[in-house]
């Protein structure tokens, strides 16, 4: 008899537990529906942060379809995926700010160079060699030009540009600006002539010929002479010879 009573007691306990769980689940659904219907939790505001060149209204419109949606029903990853499709966005974080606001923080890909293709068109690329899109709001983007005689078919927005000459220019450029930050804005163009890397200095209009050997010493000599002695406008400055500067 005691065993039968114990079994019936366990059965009642499990039945009661199931009823309680079902009641909680039902109550949760009712509460969720109630919250979803409350206007206070409908998304009303979208805040955009971190953009420098990409137009704020453009970024706002990418998240605008979620206006009026209950904030509890929004998956932030769904919003983030809309932004990752843009070539200029390197990273994005979407946060909920209760009761009715979402905050979109973007990290832009910023152009380092314009690459000129064989047809003469310019394409911005970032520090990772990714080709960026062009739009009217990037009109103030002022970047050094890279002329490596590349075919238009090799360039696609959102894709990484692979070219050994371009890799060499990146290496040289970053070494140069470590020596003098002014060179970020002082260089107007990089190009190859007779398999030698050249660049044009904006201040003097001079063409400077470089070699990879002892690049730091070449750049230091050029900067010192330019700032203290100056060069005749549009001269050619050959830095390939150790300890010498040849002016043509």
What are these regions (language model features)?
Residues 48:
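Extended, alpha-helix-rich binding/interface surfaces that flank or overlap catalytic cores
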Residues 1-45, 57-70, 77-81, 85, ...:
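Charged, solvent-exposed interaction patches on well-folded alpha/beta domains
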Residues 53-55:
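Extracytoplasmic beta-rich repeat domains
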């Amino acid at each position: 008899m005691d065993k039968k009573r114990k079994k019936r007691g366990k059965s009642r306990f499990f039945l009661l537990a199931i009823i309680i769980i079902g009641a909680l689940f039902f109550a949760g659904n009712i509460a969720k529906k109630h919250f979803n219907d409350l206007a206070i939790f409908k998304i009303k505001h979208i805040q955009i942060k971190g953009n420098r060149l990409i137009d704020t209204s453009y970024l706002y419109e990418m998240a605008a379809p979620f206006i009026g949606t209950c904030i509890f029903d929004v998956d932030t990853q769904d919003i983030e995926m809309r932004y990752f499709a843009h070539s200029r966005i390197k990273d994005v974080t979407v946060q909920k700010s209760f009761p009715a606001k979402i905050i979109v923080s973007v990290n832009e890909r910023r152009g380092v160079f314009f690459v000129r293709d064989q047809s003469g068109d310019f394409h911005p690329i970032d520090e990772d060699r990714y080709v960026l899109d062009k739009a009217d709001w990037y009109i103030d983007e002022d970047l050094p030009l890279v002329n490596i005689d590349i075919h238009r078919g090799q360039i696609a927005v959102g894709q990484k540009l692979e070219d050994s000459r371009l890799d060499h220019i990146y290496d040289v450029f970053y070494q140069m600006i470590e020596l003098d930050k002014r060179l970020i804005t002082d260089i107007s163009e990089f190009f190859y002539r007779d398999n030698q890397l050249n660049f044009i200095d904006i201040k003097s209009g001079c063409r400077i010929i470089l070699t990879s050997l002892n690049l730091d010493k070449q750049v230091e000599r050029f900067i010192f002479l330019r700032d203290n002695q100056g060069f005749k406008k549009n001269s050619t400055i050959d830095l390939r010879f150790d300890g010498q500067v040849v002016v043509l």
